[in-house]
């Protein structure tokens, strides 16, 4: 069976039919008759194409040339077929319409690669979006659970406080819950009650003073907060969290040398502290600059 994407177009003229090749989505199908003939389907019409031998005999008869028998022509099929194939390829390569049609039928690997690349980008964006949604959902659920836990804890502790059976530790826990819920006045109240009722270890009491100092600083009551932090480090000198909070409060109050001293105290107990080290290094430069400005002003006076 012969299969091809080529269609023959017959051009009428005074000369014998000339067959020109155009690329199209038709097929050359073998005829049901003699094997020397091929039927060609063109736009719903079937055209019989003569074999090479019949075509040569017709040309000789039309031009009045000496007759040749088929036996002598059997020596020429290879040369004739090669010649016709060369002529067909020459016409295909020379005709611009044929070249354009050939370009249409050629596969386009660049287009396919670009399409795959675009699809991969879309999938990447989709996966990224799903990941962000998943992370956001996780944090939202976590916050809801934490808030619910705090609410339950606060409710239970408040019931004990109302009954008058709350211990100093329970008052401290209730004050810490209020601090986390950002109810600072309530946190101050319960933490102060815990300090007054405290009868345990002084080092544990330092945590109560530190929590009360944090509550005051968040209300922008820096002096009261600093006083609580200083009490905490007095009760527990190695309490690095209270030292960091004290340094932060001093820096907010623009007392840079005292803030620098607090962060240096942290590094004495914890040399690799990730909070105190960068703060200390930044404050060193600021303190040097501040001292230089003060020295210049004193000289001018």
Swiss-Prot record:
Induction (UniProt): Induced by light.
Q: Which SMART domains does the UniProt record give?
A: TPR
Keyword rRNA-binding on entry? no
GO biological process, any: photosystem I assembly
Its keywords, alphabetically, are: Chloroplast, Membrane, Plastid, Repeat, Thylakoid, TPR repeat, Transit peptide, Transmembrane, Transmembrane helix
After gene disruption, what is the outcome? Seedling lethality when homozygous. Dwarf and pale yellowish phenotype when grown on MS medium supplemented with 2% sucrose.
Bilayer-crossing regions: 82-102, 121-141
Q: Which domain of life is it from?
A: Eukaryota
Signal peptide (from-to): none
Q: Which residues form a coiled coil?
A: none
A Gene Ontology cellular-component term: chloroplast
Q: Where are the TPR repeats?
A: 168-201, 206-239, 240-273
Specify the protein's topology with respect to the membrane.
Answer: Multi-pass membrane protein
Cysteine pairs bridged by disulfides in the record? none
UniProt entry tagged with the keyword DNA-binding: no
Q: What span is annotated as transit peptide?
A: 1-61
**Tell me, how does this one assemble?**
Interacts with PSA3.
Q: What does this protein do?
A: Nuclear genome-encoded factor required for the accumulation of photosystem I (PSI). Functions as a PSI biogenesis factor. Cooperates with PSA3 to promote the stable assembly of PSI in the thylakoid membrane. May target primarily the PsaC subunit.
Q: What is this protein called?
A: Tetratricopeptide repeat domain-containing protein PYG7, chloroplastic
């Amino acid at each position: 069976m012969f299969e091809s994407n080529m269609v023959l177009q017959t051009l009428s003229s005074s000369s014998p039919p000339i067959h020109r090749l155009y690329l199209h989505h038709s097929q050359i199908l073998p005829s049901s008759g003699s094997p020397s003939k091929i039927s060609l389907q063109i736009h719903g019409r079937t055209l019989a194409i003569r074999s090479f031998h019949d075509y040569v005999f017709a040309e000789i008869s039309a031009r009045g040339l000496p007759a040749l028998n088929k036996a002598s022509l059997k020596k020429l099929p290879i040369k004739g077929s090669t010649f016709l194939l060369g002529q067909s390829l020459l016409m295909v390569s020379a005709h611009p319409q044929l070249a354009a049609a050939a370009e249409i039928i050629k596969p386009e690997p660049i287009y396919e690669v670009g399409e795959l690349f675009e699809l991969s980008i879309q999938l990447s964006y989709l996966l990224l979006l799903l990941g962000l949604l998943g992370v956001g959902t996780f944090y939202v659920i976590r916050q809801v659970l934490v808030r619910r836990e705090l609410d339950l804890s606060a409710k239970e502790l408040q019931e004990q406080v109302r009954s008058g059976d709350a211990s100093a530790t329970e008052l401290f826990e209730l004050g810490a819950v209020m601090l986390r819920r950002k109810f600072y006045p309530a946190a101050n109240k319960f933490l102060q009650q815990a300090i007054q009722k405290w009868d345990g270890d002084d080092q544990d009491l330092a945590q109560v003073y530190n929590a009360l100092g944090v509550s005051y600083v968040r209300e922008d009551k820096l002096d009261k907060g600093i006083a609580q932090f200083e009490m905490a480090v007095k009760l527990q000198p190695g309490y690095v969290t209270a030292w960091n909070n004290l340094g932060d409060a001093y820096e907010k109050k623009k007392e840079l040398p005292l803030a620098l001293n607090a962060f240096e105290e942290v590094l004495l107990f914890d040399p690799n502290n990730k909070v105190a080290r960068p703060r200390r290094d930044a404050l060193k430069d600021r303190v040097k600059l501040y001292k230089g400005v003060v020295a210049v002003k004193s000289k001018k006076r």
